Regions:
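Alpha-helical elements of the RecA-like P-loop NTPase motor core of helicases
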Residues: 19, 23, 45, 78
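Non-catalytic, surface beta->alpha helical segment in thiol-disulfide oxidoreductase systems
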Residues: 61-87
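Thioredoxin-like thiol-disulfide oxidoreductase module
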Residues: 36-54, 80-86
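Nucleotide phosphate-binding site architecture
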Residues: 16, 38, 77
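Long, continuous compositionally biased terminal/linker segments
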Residues: 51-53, 57-60, 75
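Loop/helix-junction capping segments adjacent to catalytic residues or to phosphate/diphosphate-binding pockets
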Residues: 18, 41, 70
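Local sequence-structure signature of Cys/Sec-based thiol-disulfide redox active-site neighborhoods
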Residues: 1-33
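Catalytic phosphate/metal-binding cores of nucleic-acid and nucleotide-processing enzymes, i.e., regions
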Residues: 23, 49, 71, 75
């Protein structure tokens, strides 16, 4: 059986795509950690600027001490379905 990845999600309350990302990871039996922030939290604003990304969730794949920015819900879904190179 293929080893499941571990993911880290930055989310905000009442975000439907954040909820769908968490449900998708649960359904696919991946481990994940969620940090829920408000829209104006300094960490979220800084990450959006650093990653040049304007929406949530912001999904990272954890690999040891490293992390790789995946994107949002749609990007996560493509990755988990093996379609990350499809456009």
């Amino acid at each position: 059986m293929k080893e499941r990845g571990t993911y880290f999600l930055y989310t905000i309350p009442e975000c439907p795509y954040c909820t769908m990302a968490k449900e998708l990871l649960r359904d696919k039996q991946h481990k994940f950690v969620v940090m829920e922030l408000n829209r104006e939290h300094a960490t979220l604003l800084r990450l959006k600027e650093e990653m040049d990304w304007g929406t949530v969730p912001m999904v990272f794949q954890l690999e040891g001490r490293n992390h790789k920015f995946i994107g949002g819900y749609v990007d996560l879904k493509k990755k988990l379905e093996g379609k990350e190179n499809d456009e």
